[in-house]
Amino acid sequence: MATLTAKERTDFTRSSLRNIRTSGHVPGIIYGKDTGNKPVSLDSVELIKTLRDEGKNAVITLEVSGEKHSVMVTDLQTDPLKNEITHADFQVVNMSEDIEVEVPIHLTGEAIGVKNGGVLQQPLYALTVKAKPKAIPQTIEADISSLDVNEVLTIADLPAGGDYSFNHESDEVVASILPPQQQEAAEVDEEESADAQPEGENEQ
């Protein structure tokens, strides 16, 4: 388990937040049932490295004022122009209790239906997973190699983990292969809708 060191914040002015960020640190907050809300700041490079190495759903040891907490990142705010993390939320977790988190789906393989001219549709990109913190997967892999035209991949088809469960209906669609003509018809309908103009009131 990776360990990060954070400092407790007592100054909440805008100038203080600006100074934290310009010094290469990220303001954040650590919260939990028995912890309350505790504003903190931590090294930006170390945070990015930890998330890259461990994954966003990893359990991290966050040390604040000599006290260690098992936490997970629940929210990251970023500046898209500077590509920087501007704020981070850390939730204290009980390692023996189940929690629910969003886990991304990663489709693997090339579907037979796509090779035959079909079009891959993926309506679901993340799953709500329930598990103890250490058992949460970083991604859920779904093999679509055998998926043919007019076939669907549902929650029931995903590999079940003995240590976690999905908080979804079993028939919820993860991916499907549309016939080429169905995709073309949908595109034509969209074009016709865009080109349609309402009739003028004074038109003879």
Curated annotation (Swiss-Prot):
Gene3D superfamilies per UniProt: Ribosomal protein L25, beta domain (2.170.120.20), Ribosomal Protein L25, Chain P (2.40.240.10)
UniProtKB keywords: Ribonucleoprotein, Ribosomal protein, RNA-binding, rRNA-binding, Stress response
Region named Disordered: 177-204
Top-level taxon of the source organism: Bacteria
GO cellular component annotations of the record: cytosolic large ribosomal subunit
Effect on the protein of changing residue 13 to I: In strain: IS58
Keyword Transit peptide: no
GO process annotations (BP): translation
Biased composition (Acidic residues): 186-204
Triggers of expression: By heat shock, salt stress, oxidative stress, glucose limitation and oxygen limitation.
InterPro entries registered for this protein in UniProt: Rbsml_bL25/Gln-tRNA_synth_N, Ribosomal_bL25/Gln-tRNA_synth, Ribosomal_bL25_b-dom, Ribosomal_bL25_C, Ribosomal_bL25_long, Ribosomal_L25_dom, Ribosomal_uL5_bac-type
Gene disruption phenotype: Cells sporulate poorly at 48 degrees Celsius.
Recorded GO MF terms: 5S rRNA binding; structural constituent of ribosome
Reported effect, residue 10 to Q: In strain: IS58
HAMAP family named in the record: Ribosomal_bL25_CTC (MF_01334)
Family: Belongs to the bacterial ribosomal protein bL25 family. CTC subfamily.
Its job: Not required for exponential growth; probably functions in vegetatively growing cells, maybe required for accurate translation under stress conditions.
Subunit structure: Part of the ribosome (presumably the 50S subunit) under heat-stress but not control growth conditions. Binds 5S rRNA.
Name of the featured protein: General stress protein Ctc
